[in-house]
Amino acid sequence: MNISRELSMKKLVHSALNIVTHPHSPENYLKLFSAAQKLEIPVRVRGEQYGSIIHVSKLDKDQKLSPILGEIVKYTNIDKHSDWYDLVSKDVASEEDQLKIKQLPDHLKPNMARFSFIFFPDTHLMVFETYCDSKTLSINYAQKIVHDTLNNPLLLDKFGEVNVTVIPQTDQIDELLNLTGLKTLRIIKGIVNNLLGIVNT
C-alpha cells in the first residue's frame, strides 16, 4: 500500500481499528458515528486527558456505502479551581492570578491535537493518524476514545454494543484495504481541516 501526503511533506504514521456492530449493516455505521458526534460527550482517557470524535461526514455523499471521514481530537481538561504554581515566585499563584485562570471560558481546552480517520463500512476498518504535526495519539488512547464514544449508554438501545479492537499489524491493514479494491490510500492534509481521500488505481 502506497501512502502519501499532499500539501505537506510531514511525517505520517497510521494505525487501524476494527469496528463491528450487530447486525453488520454498512448503512448503520454512518448513523452511529453521526449520533455519537451529536452527543458531544467527551471520553476521559487518562487523568486530565480527554478525547472526542468530531467532523463526521461521508467521503462521497452520493455513494450509499461511502467511507466515513472524521477526526479524533484530544485535549487537556484542567481543573481551574486547583492550586496553580507560579514559576516566578516559586510558590502558589496569587489570588489575582488564580482569578484570571478561573475566568477562562469553560469551552476552551488546552493542548489540543487532532488526528484524521477514515472508516470503511464494508470491511469495518478505521484507519487513523497516530502522528500529526509532531503530536501523537497512542493506539490504546484511540481505541478507548472510539469504544467509549460508540458505546455511550445513550446509544446502546438504538445501536447495541459496538466491538472495537486494535489491528496490530500493518500487513493486516493492507490486506483489509485490498478487499475494497483500493490500492492507494492518499491522505490529504488541508490548511483549514483534515481530509482523508481515497484514490483508486
Predicted regions and their residues:
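Terminal interaction module
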Residues: 1-91, 133-201
